């Protein structure tokens, strides 16, 4: 299974790094499961929302065809929602059979591409109304950490991507494997505030 984590200028760091940590821990910790994970972007270097510079493993031209796509949110998604090439790429990935997942405002790009039509979905709490405005057929779930609607999985804001990624491990392999990965990354949140 090939997992593509999408990067772009303005991508929210934890939106992609949280799922990356979960899914890469799975790939490296259990190599027999046959998971390959890589980053992909329009350009080799991107500057994320909080200023972090990251080098992508692949551009879209060199990336292997993914079985699963993680599309983060962040300020960069604002331009993506109106970019015909980005929206077509998303549709082509879906049409190619990839399981399409998003974190935070990545779901707004999916909505603009038509992926969320007549589906339940969620996004970052600050853009719930925008999700509903982009496509009134979406069954918006404002209180969900993530929503699995089969071919598309959307997560709420930022840290919810970690929960979604653990769900993906359970869905694609087993609950036991997801628990092993969760233990490995020592993810057992008890916020102090």
Task: Provide a role label for each language-model segment.
Residues 147-148:
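Generic beta-strand structural signal
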Residues 115-133:
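Short, glycine-/small-residue-rich phosphate/pyrophosphate-handling segment
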Residues 103, 158:
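Conserved alpha/beta-hydrolase "nucleophile elbow" surrounding the catalytic nucleophile
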Residues 151-157:
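A short glycine-threonine-serine/GTX helix/turn-capping micro-motif
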Residues 7, 123, 156:
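Small/polar loops that bind or transfer phosphate-bearing groups
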Residues 100-101, 122, 141, 153:
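Structural detector of well-ordered beta-strand residues that form the stable sheet scaffold
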Residues 1-100, 107-112, 129-143, 162-193:
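Extended, subdomain-level signal for the structured scaffold at the beginning of enzyme domains
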């Amino acid at each position: 299974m090939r997992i593509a984590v999408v990067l772009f200028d303005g991508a929210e760091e934890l939106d992609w790094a949280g799922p990356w940590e979960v899914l890469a821990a799975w790939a490296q910790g259990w190599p027999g499961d046959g998971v390959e994970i890589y980053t992909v972007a329009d350009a080799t270097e991107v500057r994320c929302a909080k200023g972090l510079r990251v080098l992508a493993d692949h551009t879209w031209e060199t990336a292997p065809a993914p079985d699963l796509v993680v599309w983060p949110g962040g300020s960069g998604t604002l331009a993506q929602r109106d970019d015909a090439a980005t929206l077509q790429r998303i549709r082509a990935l879906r049409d190619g059979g990839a399981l399409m997942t998003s974190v935070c405002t990545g779901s707004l790009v999916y909505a603009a591409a038509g992926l969320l039509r007549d589906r339940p979905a969620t996004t970052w709490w600050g853009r719930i109304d925008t999700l509903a405005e982009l496509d009134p057929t979406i069954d918006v779930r404002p209180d969900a950490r993530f929503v699995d609607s089969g071919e598309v999985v959307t997560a709420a804001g930022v840290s919810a991507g970690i929960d979604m990624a653990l769900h993906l491990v359970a869905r694609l392999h087993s609950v036991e494997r997801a628990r092993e990965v969760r233990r490995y990354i020592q993810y057992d949140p008890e916020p102090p505030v």
